[in-house]
Amino acid sequence: MARILITGSTDGFGFEAARQLIERKHQVYLHARNQERADEVKTKLPGAAGVLIADLTTVAETRKLADEANAIGTFDAVILNAGLLYGPFRKSDLGVPASVFVNLVSPYIFAALLNPPKRLIFIASVLHHEADTSLKDIFWLERGEKEWKDFPAYCDAKFHVVLLVNAIARRFKDTSVIAVHPGYVPTKLAGQDAPGKMEDGIETYVMLAEGDYDTSLTGVYFDPKKERAQPHALTADLDKQEAVVKACEELTGIKLPSP
């Protein structure tokens, strides 16, 4: 039995992965952004070990989530599933657009503060291949609301996440750090017209959570078919990897250990 935490697990991929992992007798901790959502998911998944509550658009709440997770103990697997794509423009407490914060900054903070688990899984996307790879204005602070475009921002954040996965993999020597593209499937994030099959992505989540792969692998990218895939070539650039780490450190004041 593995101890597993899945962020953003009140619906979509996170919920379904949690449901299946609970059925497989794992100790699964859920995450909800508020008490109402927590109460709803506890009713739907009564076999969950617990529900942690945090709004991942703020530093303080993300830090609280890490503290509460650490108090439970070291996890076998953590899936950083929470994400945003479309929706009205709003800012995090640091002035960063909420989707950039949830997709990139909050996972960085959480990973930096968490007791390293055996397996740490970040949600990437095949859309990272469409990103602006220049690393200019990573957090959209210069462009702001007037120039905001949610789809390009999402693509960029996922490119930065794959860079971050590589950087963290060099630091967490005893952790298998993985990026995964879950697939373009009907979820709240992707919309109900998405053509893919959720079952494929869920199977990959379950495989990674259970460690049913070569766990000596780290800093690698999986597709929804449980296979390793080739990320954008520039995600192997060490300077770009460290530039994303430095940007996140300077923004948040929270540091990763040195590689």
UniProtKB/Swiss-Prot annotation:
A matching Pfam family: adh_short
SUPFAM superfamilies the record matches: NAD(P)-binding Rossmann-fold domains
Chain's role: Short-chain dehydrogenase; part of the gene cluster that mediates the biosynthesis of the yellow pigment chrysogine. Pyruvic acid and anthranilic acid are likely substrates for the nonribosomal peptide synthetase chry1/NRPS14, with pyruvic acid adenylated by the first A domain and anthranilic acid by the second. If pyruvic acid and anthranilic acid are merged and released from chry1/NRPS14 by hydrolysis, a subsequent amidation would lead to 2-pyruvoylaminobenzamide. This process is probably catalyzed by the amidotransferase chry2 using glutamine as amino donor.
Residues binding NADP(+): R37, D55, N81, Y154, K158, V185, T187
Gene it is expressed from: chry4
Family under the similarity heading: Belongs to the short-chain dehydrogenases/reductases (SDR) family.
Record-listed E.C. numbers: 1.1.1.-
Pathway participation: Pigment biosynthesis
Single Gene Ontology MF annotation: oxidoreductase activity
Protein name per UniProt: Short-chain dehydrogenase chry4
